[in-house]
């Protein structure tokens, strides 16, 4: 295999969990490198559905080491509930490792997150209310609690005995909320610590050893490129770095250790929460995509906003992440449509632009410029090769590859593992930079011309 990063190429919810699950078969180590319980992925294996938020998708393979790395923020209550759920389903977590340097979400983070959203009013960001932003804020302010702090009861008690009264000042003076009682929180987190203790390790050192042993490592990002703190639709973003570069910081490895980057995108576009969304459909087609695609968030249950595929943000994701290939998911959701539109550029103040604007105010005024392609009436759910697809579906995928100038290696046609077409080996196929040596072209069913 290689050391591979899987990233979302849109606003999250692209189906990264399924793709990671598929690729995990050839990996020795699977790493979640950022985010927290604000992200979720759903896996369907053998008729069983698994909904996970923190634990890497590779946990379903008992011989894969699964690491929750330093770049994540960990809610012990949710993590332990996931561990218990897996145990109830007969799945071992002996292969799970938690970075001792990851930061911990506490009750005051969740309370502040919800209170701050309410305080923002019409300027709310649409957070999940799970305390992720406040946890990362404490990390940046160097006042956070880390997993390693949980391992030392006296130190944890001392840190929380200072932190909780500090946060109570904010709760009372800024948000007009009652203060939190420190003692129950301290006792609860001491109990969490004992249950988590067997999993805690120096994850960066573990990864370094795996790299030195030439093991195959799969890095699993949460959310998506357009939610990146620096490169997303700021301020409507997450508080970490879902992009490929975030894998290095979040996991504690050097950039030369990454061999390949795979982007995951839906065959259309969705977004949860607030923020600009040029191709959003507020008509019956948008409702059809939402209903057919079961577009409800794994974490919050909120209905996702749906729209046509946006090639502008797609090209941006290719550039920002250095994508080598794409996995296109939920192609089957487009079955039955008479025509399908793809955004190829934006109109802004009477002129055409083909780049993603960094200013959210500009982005909010962008109108999509569409190319219209014919749809297909037959089902694609049972297709298992490119040749099985209706010609219109094949042409649609070819158009996306051409638009984004990156090959499509995987096509997903449903939630199950077997509802997948492997067009080209996503691990050992050509890197995008090598597709056209000496000006030549490489034949590929879904390769840009």
Curated annotation (Swiss-Prot):
Active site (catalytic residues): 13, 41
Cellular-component GO terms for this entry: cytoplasm
Binding site for substrate: 298-304
Matches recorded under InterPro entries: Adenylosuccin_syn_GTP-bd, Adenylosuccin_syn_Lys_AS, Adenylosuccinate_synth_dom1, Adenylosuccinate_synth_dom2, Adenylosuccinate_synth_dom3, Adenylosuccinate_synthetase, P-loop_NTPase
Annotated residues for binding of IMP: 13-16, 38-41, 128, 142, 223, 238, 302
Pathway the protein contributes to: Purine metabolism; AMP biosynthesis via de novo pathway; AMP from IMP: step 1/2
Amino acids binding Mg(2+): 13, 40
Cited Gene3D superfamilies: Adenylosuccinate Synthetase, subunit A, domain 1, Adenylosuccinate Synthetase, subunit A, domain 2, Adenylosuccinate Synthetase, subunit A, domain 3
SUPFAM superfamilies the UniProt entry points to: P-loop containing nucleoside triphosphate hydrolases
Location(s) in or outside the cell: Cytoplasm
A biological-process GO annotation: 'de novo' AMP biosynthetic process
Superkingdom of source: Bacteria
Major localisation: cytoplasm
Subunit and partners: Homodimer.
Similarity-based family: Belongs to the adenylosuccinate synthetase family.
Protein name from the UniProt record: Adenylosuccinate synthetase
Organism listed in the record: Synechococcus sp. (strain JA-2-3B'a(2-13)) (Cyanobacteria bacterium Yellowstone B-Prime)
């Amino acid at each position: 295999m290689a050391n591979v990063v899987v990233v979302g190429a849109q606003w999250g919810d692209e189906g990264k969990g399924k793709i990671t699950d598929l690729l995990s078969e050839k990996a020795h180590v699977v790493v979640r490198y950022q985010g927290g319980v604000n992200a979720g992925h759903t896996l369907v294996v053998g008729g069983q559905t698994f909904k996970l938020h923190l634990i890497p998708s590779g946990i379903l393979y008992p011989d894969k080491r699964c690491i929750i790395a330093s770049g994540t923020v960990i809610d012990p209550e949710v993590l332990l509930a996931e561990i218990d759920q897996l145990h109830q389903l007969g799945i071992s977590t002996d292969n799970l490792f938690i970075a001792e340097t990851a930061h911990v979400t506490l009750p005051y983070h969740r309370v502040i997150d919800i209170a701050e959203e309410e305080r923002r009013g019409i300027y709310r960001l649409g957070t999940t209310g799970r305390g992720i932003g406040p946890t990362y804020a404490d990390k940046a302010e160097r006042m956070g609690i880390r997993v390693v702090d949980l391992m030392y009861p006296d130190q944890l008690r001392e840190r929380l005995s200072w932190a909780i009264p500090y946060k109570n000042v904010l709760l009372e003076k800024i948000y007009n909320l009652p203060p939190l009682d420190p003692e129950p929180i301290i006792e609860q987190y001491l109990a969490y610590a004992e249950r988590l203790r067997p999993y805690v390790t120096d994850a960066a050192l573990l990864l370094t050893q795996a790299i030195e042993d030439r093991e195959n490592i799969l890095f699993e990002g949460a959310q998506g490129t357009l939610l990146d703190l620096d490169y997303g639709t700021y301020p409507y973003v997450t508080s970490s770095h879902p992009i490929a570069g975030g894998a290095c910081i979040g996991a504690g490895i050097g950039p030369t250790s990454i061999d390949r980057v795979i982007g995951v995108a839906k065959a259309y576009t969705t977004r949860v929460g607030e923020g600009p969304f040029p191709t959003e459909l507020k008509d019956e087609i948008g409702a059809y995509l939402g209903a057919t695609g079961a577009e409800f968030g794994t974490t919050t249950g909120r209905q996702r906003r749906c729209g046509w595929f946006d090639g502008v943000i797609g090209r941006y994701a290719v550039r920002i992440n250095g994508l080598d290939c794409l996995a296109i998911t939920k192609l089957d959701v487009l079955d039955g449509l008479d025509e399908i539109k793809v955004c190829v550029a934006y109109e802004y103040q009477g002129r055409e632009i083909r780049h993603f604007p960094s200013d959210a105010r500009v982005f909010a005024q962008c109108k999509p410029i569409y190319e219209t392609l014919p749809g297909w009436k037959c089902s694609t759910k049972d297709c298992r090769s490119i040749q099985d697809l209706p010609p219109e579906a094949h042409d649609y995928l070819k158009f996306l590859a051409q638009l984004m100038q990156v090959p499509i290696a995987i096509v997903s046609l449903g939630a199950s593992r077997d509802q997948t077409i492997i067009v080209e080996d996503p691990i050992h196929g050509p890197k995008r930079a090598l597709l056209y040596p000496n000006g030549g072209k490489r034949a590929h069913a879904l390769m840009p011309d």
